[in-house]
Amino acid sequence: MVIERVLSAAGWSRCGQGDWAVVLVSPSGRLAARVSPFDPVMPYTADLFRRAAATALVPVLHASREFEGGAVYTVMERLHAAEPHEGKAFFRALAARTPEVTDLARAIDVVVERARRELPWFGPLDENPSNVMRRDGGDLVLTDPFYADGPNLYDSLLADPMRVARAIPEEKRRHMFELPLAESGPFDPDARQRMELGLAAADARLGQGRLP
């Protein structure tokens, strides 16, 4: 990805990767950048970080940008792994809406309501304990609470590509087949070709005003 190459040239180094994104750490070690060629959920995560900034229960967001074609990146404070039991306790507090997390829970509600209206493949709150991390000062923060239902989204490209074409503008998904897929492995070549052809045909029909 061009964004990763630019950051690498500036001295940033890759420190992790998953199915949707790679993570780089700044030369100072104080910042982390998450870079994805396609992540329709990331704008909602950035929205949450802004809305809930005053709670000090989300990372400090230094930058967030969507590029032409759909690539996205965010820069935030670098965080460190917390103990699994701490993450579980954090999510229990959210579920119970205990006083110390009430404002965060309300911010999550607002973002989730909007996301579910706009993105059919928006997943529920991801309660994986690893999504709670620790900042340098020791405080716990919620880092990656939302996710796209990837299997369902990509299956939709085979079953109903028009649904995807309508829900996600073409200019926001040009790189949707360039995901790192570090955990689940690469796309099946035949399935990928069928996905691409189906989506291209759907885009052509939309562009010509020929809606089914």
Where is each model-derived feature located?
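ATP-binding glycine-rich loop module of kinase domains
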Residues: R5-T55, P59-R65
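Conserved hydrophobic "DFG−1" position in protein kinase catalytic cores
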Residues: V25, V35, V75-R78, R134
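Conserved structural core of kinase catalytic domains
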Residues: P37, A53-V110
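Catalytic activation segment of kinase domains across protein kinase-like and atypical kinase folds
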Residues: W121-L179
